[in-house]
């Protein structure tokens, strides 16, 4: 397994968005089977991509750990893009970028819904963040940008032209169940995202300090926690539901991944593990039985 680092290599954003543009047509076809909200669900994470340097290896790993299946597609120019499914539920996409000059780019990247991506990018810049790429048009999907927030955490922005996945789709094992920012300044980060996407902030007192939840349309959209040590760069952590977190964590190690934080009663009642896949992408496993 590769060593992982939570760093930003801006060059790979350009490649990612070019791939998304090329493969937006097959994604558009698949969206026709998803219940979509008539209104924009600003602040909601509405899509995720795994950027990896070895799609075949990543497919094997996630098939064993999360039970995923896949559909390989190609867009204009023959660029490959893999759609990820948990049962019949479309979960995310997967793209391969194997460029030795762009180290440490393997990661999960989430996209937040915004009403107007151009205005959102202007806001990001006004608060000390940056737009690494975009906004760009994604045929049949909408407009997207990839940004670094003021603390340099990477996230995508998506202004959907077809509607956002409706909140009636319940979380379940195998799909994304939560998104969490590990932050160097949780209060500042919460204010930034709340202002960017029109969200409310709810503060919860927890054993390790204040946990901030971002809400919009009456729904919890994401959480923000202080980073445990100063040597961790701020980053968004994607949580995937599993039936048994201890079993899933054991599968991670059996399939060549690494468990950074195993399930423990001292941390969120043992319901969560933080792991790294064999290519170096960090993610969380969350026990989800609802």
Residue ranges and their predicted role:
Residues 4, 23-40, 44-53, 83, 100-123, 128-177, ...:
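Vicinal oxygen chelate
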Residues 28-30, 49-89, 126, 134-142, ...:
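Core segments of cupin and vicinal oxygen chelate
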Residues 76-126, 132-133, 138, 224:
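Intrinsically disordered, glycine/charged-rich N-terminal periplasmic/extracytoplasmic linker segments
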Residues 78, 106, 208, 234, ...:
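Residues that act as N-cap/strand-start positions at coil-to-secondary-structure junctions
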Residues 6-8:
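Short hydrophobic transmembrane-like helices used for membrane targeting/insertion
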Residues 10-21:
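Bacterial N-terminal signal peptides
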Residues 33, 39, 53-55, 115:
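Residue-level hotspots at or immediately adjacent to binding/recognition sites across diverse folds
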